[in-house]
Amino acid sequence: MNSFPWLTIFVGLPISAGFLIFVFPHRGNKVIRWYTIFICVLELLLMTYAFSYYFQLDDPLIQLTESYKWINFFDFYWRLGIDGLSLGPILLTGFITTLATLAARPITRDSRLFHFLMLAMYSGQIGLFSSQNLLLFFIMWELELIPVYLLLAMWGGKQRLYSATKFILYTAGSSVFLLMGALGIAFYASNEPTFNFETSANQSYPVTLEILFYIGFLIAFAVKSPIIPLHTWLPDTHGEAHYSTCMLLAGILLKMGAYGLVRINMELLSHAHSIFSSWLIIVGAIQIIYAASTSSGQKNLKKRIAYSSVSHMGFTIIGIYSISDMGLNGAILQIISHGFIGAALFFLSGTSYDRIRLVYLDEMGGMATLMPKIFMMFSILSLASLALPGMSGFFAELVVFFGIITAKKFFLMPKILITFVTAVGTILTPIYLLSMLRQMFYGYKLFNATNSYFFDSGPRELFVSIAILLPVISIGIYPDFVFSLSVDKVEAILSNYFYS
C-alpha cells in the first residue's frame, strides 16, 4: 500500500483545476489557455517523477496502490494502482493531452468550458487506466462520454450534431453492456458484491456464464477500440471534430477499448478469451484489409485518416487475441505507437485546414510549394504510419507478426493464412497514405482557395509536430523502452493460459 496518494492526485488534479476556471474572474482566452497548459504540464511532470522513483519495472504486481472506503452500502472502494500494462497509456495520456491543449489555440468561443472539458477528459482517462475496481472503471469510462459529446456538438463542423449524437448512441449504448458485465461479476456467488480486480481475477465461472460476461465486455470495448462492424461512429466523429479533439480521440480514447480488452477480458475471463481468440483474430485481419481499402476511397482527409486508425487497430486486436508473449507485447507497443502517430496526423490535417479551408482531397494540390514545413512533417509522419523501419510502427507490426507465427494455440496453416492476409493489409497502407500525400501536396496549385491562408507552419505547429515525432523515432530505434514496461506483466497474464 502506497503511503502517499500519488494516483488520487493525478486523477483529481486536472478536473479540480478545471473547476477553478469558472471560479476565477475571466481574464481572457489567452490566460485560460496557458493556465490549462500549465496544469497539463504539471501533471505530466509529477507523473514522470512519481513513476521514475516509485515504480519498479521488474515487478509485475500492482504498484502505488491506494484503497479508500467510498460507499459503505455495498462495500465500494476507491481503489487505484498501476502496473506495466497501465503505465504506458498513462504517460501517453499526459503527453498527448498536453499537446492537444496547446493545439487548441484557435478556440476562442466558450473558451472556459472548452478547456474545462479537456481537463475533465484528462482526469477520466488517468482514472480509467489506474482503476483497480470494476465499478470505478465503469465510472471513469462514463466520465469520458459527456466531455467528448460536448466537444463534438459545440466545436465541430457543419454535421457536428449528427456526429455527436451518433457517438453518444454508440458509446452510451455499449456502456450498458459494460455495466451489466461488471455487476454480473461482482454479484456472482456472493451476497456481498466485490468489484476488486484482484478478487475477480481469482474467481472461476461456469463456461456459459463466463461467455455471457465476456460478450458484454467485448461489445463495450469493441465500440471504443473500434472493432468492425461497430466502428461506423468513428469516421463521422473524426470528420466533424476539432483537430484537438481528434488528437484525444485517436491518441487516447481508442486505446481505452484495447486496454479494456486486456485488463478485463483477457485477465479476468481467460477461458472465454481463449474460446473467442480464433474468431477475433480473423476479425482483426479482415479489419486491416477492409479499413485500408475503405480509406483509399475516402475523399475527406480526416475520414481517410480515421479509417487508417481503424486499420491499424486491427494489429492491436490480432496481437491481443494471439495469446502469445510477442503478440501481446506487440499489441501494447502498437497502442503506444498509434497513439502518437494518429494524434500527429489529425493535428497536421487540422493545421492544413486552418490555412486552406478545404477538407476534400480532390480540391487540394500543390501545397508542398506553399507550405514546405507542413509538407515535410506530414510526409515523415505518414511514413511512420505505414511502418517505415526506424519508426515505432515498424517494430509494433513486426512483433505482432511474430506473435501470430509463434502462437502455440493455432495450427500452422491458419497462422500462415492470417499472416498472409495481414501482410496484404500492410501493402494497402502505403497506397492510401502516399495517394493522400500526392493529392494534397503535389499537382496543381490551389487556385480556388484564398491566398491569405497560405502561410507555412509557425513555431507552435512545429513544436507540437516535433514533440510527437521524437518519441516515434525514439521508440522505433529503441523499442525495448516500451517492452521493459510491459514484458513482466504480459508474462504474468499469459501464465493463466496453458498453451502460452
Curated annotation (Swiss-Prot):
It comes from the Eukaryota. Keywords: Chloroplast, Membrane, NAD, NADP, Plastid, Plastoquinone, Quinone, Thylakoid, Translocase, Transmembrane, Transmembrane helix. It is an enzyme of class 7 (translocase). One of its GO terms (biological process) is electron transport coupled proton transport. InterPro entries: NADH_Q_OxRdtase_chain4, NADH_Q_OxRdtase_chainM/4, NADH_UbQ_OxRdtase, ND/Mrp_TM. Its main location: plastid. It holds the Pfam family Proton_antipo_M. It is found in: Plastid, Chloroplast thylakoid membrane. It is a multi-pass membrane protein. GO terms for cellular component: chloroplast thylakoid membrane. The chain crosses the membrane at residues 4-24, 35-55, 84-104, 113-133, 134-154, 167-187, 211-231, 242-262, 272-292, 305-325, 330-350, 386-406, 416-436, 463-483. Its EC number is 7.1.1.-. It catalyses: a plastoquinone + NADH + (n+1) H(+)(in) = a plastoquinol + NAD(+) + n H(+)(out); a plastoquinone + NADPH + (n+1) H(+)(in) = a plastoquinol + NADP(+) + n H(+)(out). GO terms for molecular function: NADH dehydrogenase (ubiquinone) activity; ubiquinone binding. Belongs to the complex I subunit 4 family. This is NAD(P)H-quinone oxidoreductase chain 4, chloroplastic. It comes from Populus alba (White poplar). The lineage of its organism: Eukaryota, Viridiplantae, Streptophyta, Embryophyta, Tracheophyta. The gene is ndhD.
